C-alpha cells in the first residue's frame, strides 16, 4: 500500500497507508517524485492556529470576527504540490503519455490519481 504524510492532530505528522482511487476515463495516475508544502497557510493549519478555524473574515471591516467553531480539519493531508511520472492513463486521455513528467496540486503522497485537465506536462528541459 502506498504512503501519504498527514497531520492527525495539531503539530503531529505521520505516514498513513491509503488505497489508490479507481482510474476514471479522464484521469491519470502519477508516481510522485517531488513534493512541497505551502509554508504559510499550511503551517498555520498544521499548528492548529489558522484564524479561519474559529473566526470569519469580514471584508467590509477587514478584520476576523468570532464565529461558531467550525469542524476541525484533522486529520489533514500535508503538502500541496508535486511533480511526478505518469504511470497509467484513462481511456479518454489523449494529451498526456505514459512516462511524461507532470506537475499538479496534491498532498505529499506516493501516487496521485487526477483528471488530466488538472495537470501540467513539464517541458523536457526540466528533466
Where are these regions (language model features)?
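Soluble, non-transmembrane catalytic domains of enzymes that act on hydrophobic metabolites at membranes
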Residues: 7-9, 98-101, 118
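Predominantly a core beta-strand signature of beta-propeller blades
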Residues: 15, 119-121
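Short N-terminal strand-loop motif that marks the start
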Residues: 1-75
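A glycine-rich, Thr/Ser-enriched phosphate-binding loop motif common to dinucleotide/cofactor-binding enzymes
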Residues: 105, 123-127
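A glycine-/small-residue-rich N-terminal strand-loop-strand element
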Residues: 72-105
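Short loop segments at secondary-structure junctions
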Residues: 9-10, 87-92, 116-117
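A structural motif shared across PLP-dependent enzymes of the aminotransferase-like
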Residues: 105-118
